[in-house]
């Protein structure tokens, strides 16, 4: 069996075959380089988990030189050598997954937390609704599992679903023990909210600012820990990898200090990628500005396996600014109106105050997000309107203000009282259900590289994420990645000659400020063009012709942009925030389009008018294998892999 490889252009290439045990079933390639899993009788997780284990089973440390001065055991403090830092663990991202992992592994070695902006600026900090887990005696793990699988359009990995739903309550208790404060009812127990797709109340929350409270508690603990070193305003560029036969080994990451423009090389025994999603491939997203798909793109360039990128979740209810009495200035990210508003009885109306959700689904406003987003999209297109209305004003004022203080304050700031008026809402890009393929311990096919959070594809979400399962997944997988990471550190070593194995990226100072400013301006224009293409052609409802047109236009735009850069003195090893974000956005956009073109059915978040029905034989994950071909600057590492 040959592996299917997706390049930036989405073409199929073949490389050295990977052989499987005969019991694994027979994999098959679909169009556009996407390998869609296994025969129906083989569980989704069985093949994937075994693939990752087989790929990692014969670990051998790369041997390039025999006269290294190596460091065995753990590093007692942060070691540095010029612009190189040495750590036992490197963590990319400062959201719930990265911070929770850092606090655990810091008991066993030194940790670098590398974060692109301020430490709190993560998707976690913007999460409103809560964390789903079974705490109510009337609820059960089986019920939570069933809700997750139904919402995921039966593409979920059942083993992963069971693990997450079973371990979730204990992970939340750990957060509480660390100082996170959640809402409690009059009986003294945790107040449990209900959201769309859930059959029971099981959402643990802190009003409508749950993520902010979790981030606060975790950061407070991180800043107090002597073994954790936080590098803020450090933008991860590319992984440092070597190749030993068919094995890819990660030795750390290069990052640029976006305030000083110094490139720092982080050499580590283990790297956890927890960098979040890629919402900014679209013009309107609830994600913060840092969510430009950096981790997914870096992992793809480092030859990690990527999965299920066609499943982009559009949150049904982002605040529609143009419907507010006092329209705010342009935002960098859309303001989220949490799922819990509908869970608490919020009703969706069109602008004629006609309730429409019962026409689309018997669960009405409590249907899963993909159903609600498509229903709103259909209403807007049929009626030629730009937003719909979400009304919670029929509920007691005190209840509304106590449950949704953040939303109430934001709307009131712009002249709208949600206790008396409906909220204008519109779908916006929210969450990537696909990402870097991970096993049950967060392991990837790249040795020494683990993933957790939105950047990972664990199989939990399938074709559509159930509300409030994202923070839960991040907690569970951050914790599950700890022990294998510690085991890896204990048998690994840091070599202080390793820093010289790869050429160093450089800031583009030699091209001068005038030219650099021109490059940045053009890059920002290209970014808007890409976002426009993605929304127009790769949005909530898709078609083969529009996806094909998007693929063609994206590749043309990428070539035009790269040509512009190099005509203005840019070199392949140069790095800067805007340019590196842009190449990552191009990479992620291509992954989404290639994956979408390969799925010839409508399932969950992927709805195409050319294949409008679910096809049971296609209930398989989409897998993008790494490409050896470097067709563009965006698709290759800035430094070549060191071959052992």
Curated annotation (Swiss-Prot):
Binding-site positions, FAD: 94-97, 116, 123-130, 294, 454, 470-471
GO cellular component, as recorded: chloroplast
Free-text disruption phenotype from the record: Reduced alkaloids and nicotin levels associated with a lower putrescine production. Occasionally, an early senescence and a lower viability of the older leaves is observed.
GO BP of this protein: alkaloid metabolic process; NAD biosynthetic process; nicotine biosynthetic process
Oxidoreductase listed as a keyword: yes
InterPro entries (alphabetical): FAD-dep_OxRdtase_2_FAD-bd, FAD/NAD-bd_sf, Fum_R/Succ_DH_flav-like_C_sf, Fum_Rdtase/Succ_DH_flav-like_C, NadB, Succ_DH/fumarate_Rdtase_cat_sf
Pfam families cross-referenced by the UniProt entry: FAD_binding_2, Succ_DH_flav_C
EC annotation from Swiss-Prot or TrEMBL: 1.4.3.16
Keywords: Alkaloid metabolism, Chloroplast, FAD, Flavoprotein, Oxidoreductase, Plastid, Pyridine nucleotide biosynthesis, Transit peptide
Subcellular location: Plastid, Chloroplast
Reactions catalysed: L-aspartate + O2 = iminosuccinate + H2O2
Cofactor or coenzyme needed: FAD
Keyword Flavoprotein: yes
Family in the record: Belongs to the FAD-dependent oxidoreductase 2 family. NadB subfamily.
PANTHER family to which the protein is assigned, alphabetical: L-ASPARTATE OXIDASE (PTHR42716), L-ASPARTATE OXIDASE, CHLOROPLASTIC (PTHR42716:SF2)
Protein name, UniProt field: L-aspartate oxidase 2-a, chloroplastic
Organism (species): Nicotiana tabacum
Gene name, Swiss-Prot/TrEMBL: AO-2A
């Amino acid at each position: 069996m040959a592996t299917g490889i997706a390049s930036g252009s989405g073409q199929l290439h073949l490389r050295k075959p990977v052989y499987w045990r005969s019991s694994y079933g027979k994999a098959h390639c679909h169009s556009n380089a996407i390998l869609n899993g296994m025969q129906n009788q083989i569980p989704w997780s069985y093949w994937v988990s075994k693939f990752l284990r087989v790929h990692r089973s014969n670990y051998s440390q790369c041997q390039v030189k025999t006269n290294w001065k190596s460091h065995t055991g753990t590093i007692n403090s942060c070691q540095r050598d010029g612009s190189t830092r040495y750590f036992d663990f490197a963590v990319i991202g400062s959201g719930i997954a990265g911070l929770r992992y850092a606090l655990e592994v810091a008991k066993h070695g030194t940790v670098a937390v590398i974060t692109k902006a301020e430490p709190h600026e993560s998707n976690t900090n913007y999460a409103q609704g809560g964390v789903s887990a079974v705490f109510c005696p009337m609820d059960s793990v089986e019920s939570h599992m069933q809700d997750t699988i139904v919402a995921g359009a039966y593409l979920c990995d059942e083993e992963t679903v069971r693990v997450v739903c079973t371990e979730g309550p204990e992970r939340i208790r750990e957060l509480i023990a660390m100082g996170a404060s959640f809402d409690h009812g009059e009986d003294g127990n945790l107040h449990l909210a209900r959201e769309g797709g859930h059959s029971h109340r099981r959402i643990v929350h802190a009003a409508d600012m749950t993520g902010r409270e979790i981030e606060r508690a975790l950061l407070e603990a991180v800043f107090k820990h002597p073994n954790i070193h936080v590098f803020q305003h450090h933008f991860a560029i590319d992984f440092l990898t070597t190749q030993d036969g068919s094995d890819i080994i990660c030795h750390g990451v290069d990052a640029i200090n976006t305030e000083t423009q110094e490139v720092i090389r982080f050499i580590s025994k283990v790297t956890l990628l927890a960098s979040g999603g890629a919402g900014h491939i679209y013009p309107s997203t609830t994600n913060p500005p840092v969510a430009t798909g950096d981790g997914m793109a870096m992992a793809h360039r480092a030859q990690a396996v990527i999965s299920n990128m066609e499943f982009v979740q559009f949150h049904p209810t982002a605040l529609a600014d143009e419907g507010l009495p006092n329209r705010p200035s342009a935002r960098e990210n859309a303001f989220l109106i949490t799922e819990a508003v509908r869970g608490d009885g919020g009703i969706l109306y069109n602008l004629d105050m006609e309730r429409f959700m019962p026409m689309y689904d018997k669960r009405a406003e409590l249907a899963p997000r993909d159903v609600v987003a498509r229903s709103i999209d259909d209403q807007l297109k049929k009626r030629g309107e730009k937003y719909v209305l979400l009304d919670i004003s029929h509920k007691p004022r005190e209840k509304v203000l106590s449950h949704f203080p953040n939303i109430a304050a934001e709307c009131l700031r712009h002249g709208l009282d949600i206790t008396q008026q409906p909220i204008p809402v519109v779908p916006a890009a929210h969450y990537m259900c696909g990402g870097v393929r991970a096993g049950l311990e967060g392991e990837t096919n790249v040795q020494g590289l683990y993933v957790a959070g939105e950047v990972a594809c664990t199989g939990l979400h399938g074709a559509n994420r159930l509300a409030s399962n994202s923070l839960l997944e991040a907690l569970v997988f951050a914790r599950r990645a700890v022990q294998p990471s510690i085991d890896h550190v204990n048998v690994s070593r840091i070599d202080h000659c390793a820093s010289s194995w790869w050429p160093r990226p450089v800031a583009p100072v030699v091209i001068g400020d005038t030219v650099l400013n021109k490059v940045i301006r053009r890059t920002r224009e290209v970014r808007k063009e890409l976002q426009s293409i993605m929304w127009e052609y790769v949005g909530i409802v898709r078609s083969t012709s529009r996806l094909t047109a998007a693929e063609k236009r994206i590749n043309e735009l990428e070539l035009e942009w790269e040509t512009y850069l190099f005509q203005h003195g840019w070199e392949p090893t140069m790095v800067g925030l805007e340019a590196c974000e842009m190449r990552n956005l191009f990479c992620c956009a291509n992954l989404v389009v290639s994956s979408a073109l390969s799925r010839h059915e409508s399932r969950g978040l992927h709805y195409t008018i050319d294949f409008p029905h679910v096809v049971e034989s296609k209930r398989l994950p989409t897998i993008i294998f790494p490409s050896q071909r470097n067709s563009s600057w965006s698709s290759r590492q800035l430094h070549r892999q060191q071959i052992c």
